[in-house]
Every structure is written in structure tokens, then in C-alpha cells.
Amino acid sequence: MEDCLTFPSRMKAAVLAFFVLLPLLHAAPPNVVVILADDLGYGDLGCYGHPVFKTPRIDQMAAEGVKMMQFNTPAPFCAPTRAALLTGRYPFRCGMTQNPAPDGGPEADALSLPKSEVTLAQVLKSAGYATGMVGKWHLGDQTGALPTDRGFDEYYGIPYSNDMRPVQ
């Protein structure tokens, strides 16, 4: 079968594609904001259809950006949920099947996201993003396990919940 595009028409298409795609090469990368809140249900924000709660700023960010419509985790605890969100893996595949201390005893005290797991923050940082986290980390409190060791440039928060054991 004979090719229906001649050389001049191919050149025109290539030049057109070049000028259409060129601005994309210089476009600023998008900002990435992830909001993860304990005990916030799927329909508890205006942008997800709640008829009473008013969340205008979050609704605006959702309208101008991307909403997660199918994220869920098979563990009903906060640490495994965070691990799944940050690694893109099931909690049991990255070793985070329960919450670390204070209520889990010595085994849970030592629990942290394995260093071999790559986090979303590490990927974004390697792409030139400045990264930060505010709030409860809950993925380990030992050296090498804190947010600033796992790809976040800045961190303001606590390693566990507000019922942590006193430091001895």
C-alpha cells in the first residue's frame, strides 16, 4: 500500500507538532499537595459531594487539580494507610501492617517504613521538587526513619499521635 503522506506534508506536521509541544517543555511543573487526614471519610468534603460541610478552599484546589477517586488501603490503621500512599504499595508488601508505638508494645516500637521503600517525597525530590510534610508521621521515629530521612526537605509535626509515651 502506498504511503499517503508526502514528504512536504510530513514536514508540515513535524513543524506544527514542534510548535505545539515546545511550550510544554518550558512549563513550570505542577504543585503537588496531598491531604491525608485521619478519620476523614470519602464523602466528608464538599468536593466529594458532602451536602452540609463547606470546604471552599479544598474544593477549589480539587477543581483546579486532581482528586483521588480510587485510593483505598486494606488496613484500617493510619500508619499502613500512610505507607500505602507514600510508596504506592500494599501495606503488607512494605512491612507496615500495624501502627507503631505507643500501644503496640516493643515490636511496634521498632516498626518503621523499611529504608528499601521509595517514597513519593523521594521521587518528587529527585525530580527537583521542594518537599515538606506537616502533621503526624507515624512511620517510625528512629534515625533514618523520620520524614527528613525519607525525602522530605522540611517536617513540622510529631512522629506518633498525641498520646505518645514520655521520653525516659
Model-predicted regions and their roles:
Residues 1-3, 23, 28:
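Intrinsic disorder/low-complexity signature
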